[in-house]
Amino acid sequence: MKTVYIFLLILLCLSCGTANNVSETPDLQNISEEDIVRIANDDIEYEIIIIEPGFNAWLQSIARPEGYYSQNYMETRNIQWVLEWNRRVLQPFQFDPNLYQLQIDYQPQIDYGYEVNYKLFNYLVYFQMTYKQRLGGFMPRI
């Protein structure tokens, strides 16, 4: 009987290991400069850096050109999408933490200007289309 207990104890010890999770996030050292989009406005002292392989090429080739959407239209979408994004960041067991890593500090009462709203809007469209996510009640379209 003692040998059964010892055997079970050894089996229990051997089975108590942590799972080896392999992260599918891109290695930041292997990302080219072309895949980094930097948006800065020195007047209100903010900076947005988007590090997403393929986004810059998508922005230049597929996204609607600047001026296509009004700033008001993009701000409305950005507010809704950022709220949902931040909600998902805070729920890593329900949503993939590799997709939703950091919160976006986007405050509706601040006028970020056209360029920031344009690039944030297009990144959120790109993100939803690339990763098949829906951040709002409507599908993003180009």
State what each model feature region is:
Residues 1-5:
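Positively charged n-region of N-terminal signal peptides that target proteins for export
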Residues 12-15:
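C-terminal motif of bacterial Sec signal peptides marking the signal peptidase cleavage site
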Residues 17-21:
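Bacterial signal peptide processing site
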Residues 25-47:
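Post-signal peptide N-terminal segment of mature Sec-exported envelope proteins
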Residues 57-71:
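Acidic/histidine-rich, surface-exposed loop or edge segments in extracytoplasmic proteins
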Residues 70-77, 115:
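Extracytoplasmic/periplasmic, Sec-exported soluble proteins
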Residues 88-142:
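Compact alpha-helical subdomains of small soluble proteins
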